[in-house]
Amino acid sequence: MAVLSRMRLRWALLDTRVMGHGLCPQGARAKAAIPAALRDHESTEGPGTGQDRPRLRSLAELPGPGTLRFLFQLFLRGYVLHLHELQALNKAKYGPMWTTTFGTRTNVNLASAPLLEQVMRQEGKYPIRDSMEQWKEHRDHKGLSYGIFITQGQQWYHLRHSLNQRMLKPAEAALYTDALNEVISDFIARLDQVRTESASGDQVPDVAHLLYHLALEAICYILFEKRVGCLEPSIPEDTATFIRSVGLMFKNSVYVTFLPKWSRPLLPFWKRYMNNWDNIFSFGEKMIHQKVQEIEAQLQAAGPDGVQVSGYLHFLLTKELLSPQETVGTFPELILAGVDTTSNTLTWALYHLSKNPEIQEALHKEVTGVVPFGKVPQNKDFAHMPLLKAVIKETLRLYPVVPTNSRIITEKETEINGFLFPKNTQFVLCHYVVSRDPSVFPEPESFQPHRWLRKREDDNSGIQHPFGSVPFGYGVRSCLGRRIAELEMQLLLSRLIQKYEVVLSPGMGEVKSVSRIVLVPSKKVSLRFLQRQ
């Protein structure tokens, strides 16, 4: 009782917020000038020893575009929204390791699986990544604590250790199966309504938009045990505002990242960016406060022994694992992460299944062989659906949700493939390019889920490198919600393929990807969902 009383007192003081804690030096070089150490990037051997060890090269010896050329690529050639394609362009010209400089920071870009492995295996106890300064500026301006995505060091470790509970392990994620299936049932009902209202009686004109609503409904139900009306014909205004604000925040973040600070009063992007973050946090705070009020009402009605700890936030609050300020700083970020992974990945998966009917038919056969039509899949069923898991893996290979990540090794100098980098060098991990490397994935541009299935011992076409595709990251800073995201995607995709044949709408054409921090379709994805007999 004393613990819960202290919790109520701390939440009463929530409105008193605390402040958060508190282009290349070398010109462009021809591909022929790529250092031999870079051309030999396939080697994963450690540093040499003895007198035969070659001289380690320095950061200044790396190739890369000059500052002006990099700016030209971003703004005049339009790569600011296609940074993943710019990675491929620069890798083709400079090799798997090159520098780019923007402002005062020089980044080292890594675009091969062995190079990613060399960096990620040197992370240490507290992996450091890009500081996301624009996110921090909003938190500082509003007096908000930093959330899980922008904290570093021991503070990050404390948050991550607390949030891991009831989230990270597969058995813990499986506890949310019934909640997810409830939301998915409502989603399918909403999808049926949308398709029957179309002119053809089976078309969904914007699949990503509908899946975004599903993902937001699901993550809010998991975090707060509350439905937010995303799947209703008329969405509540605060929920609709949140959905709009997330999309606009990501869109404007591209510009506020690359435009100089002196341009902020002159251009609209910064003001929009800040306002959208305000809306995101307003929604998150409302959800948190409602949960606190619900817990207090249960205490008054039944006493401390009569309150059953059930959901994720309820558990964290009762155990006092996070302070009120940490909760407000972190949970809006968790909502964002829970939405983008599932909605974008499922959109791409359905798009490619519609383009590959033979794969879709094989998947339908697998799903209905385990869960016949009319039955609802459960977590245990997916152990018998290897192709379903392979479809999701292949989709994430082609479209990693976040096409780049970064690491900064602060404790020591870092030796990578014959180069010695000083402490605090920022390494940009080019996941999009690495996962389309033909030396790791034959025919890398094609959608081939079967490449992930177990093969004969004499078949060499399988995965050749464990870091070839790491869409959820690696190590202690890997994706917190990976298990829940995978479960949600498996549950939904199996039920959709069980019930519908998915085909491209007439005139749909090819869909490319755009990078707005996360990788999204370049246009609306319109699909037909044909009822299976």
Curated annotation (Swiss-Prot):
GO molecular function list: cholestanetetraol 26-dehydrogenase activity; cholesterol 26-hydroxylase activity; cholesterol 7-alpha-monooxygenase activity; cholesterol monooxygenase (side-chain-cleaving) activity; heme binding; Hsp70 protein binding; iron ion binding; vitamin D3 25-hydroxylase activity
Gene field: Cyp27a1
Organism this protein belongs to: Rattus norvegicus (Rat)
Taxonomic lineage from the root: Eukaryota, Metazoa, Chordata, Craniata, Vertebrata
Cofactors required: heme
Record's protein name: Sterol 26-hydroxylase, mitochondrial
Tissue expression notes: Expressed in liver, kidney and ovary.
Topology class, membrane: Peripheral membrane protein
Transit peptide: 1-32
Catalytic activity: 5beta-cholestane-3alpha,7alpha,12alpha-triol + 6 reduced [adrenodoxin] + 3 O2 + 5 H(+) = (25R)-3alpha,7alpha,12alpha-trihydroxy-5beta-cholestan-26-oate + 6 oxidized [adrenodoxin] + 4 H2O; cholestanol + 2 reduced [adrenodoxin] + O2 + 2 H(+) = (25R)-26-hydroxycholestanol + 2 oxidized [adrenodoxin] + H2O; (25R)-3beta-hydroxycholest-5-en-7-one-26-al + 2 reduced [adrenodoxin] + O2 + H(+) = (25R)-3beta-hydroxycholest-5-en-7-one-26-oate + 2 oxidized [adrenodoxin] + H2O; (25R)-3beta,26-dihydroxycholest-5-en-7-one + 2 reduced [adrenodoxin] + O2 + 2 H(+) = (25R)-3beta-hydroxycholest-5-en-7-one-26-al + 2 oxidized [adrenodoxin] + 2 H2O
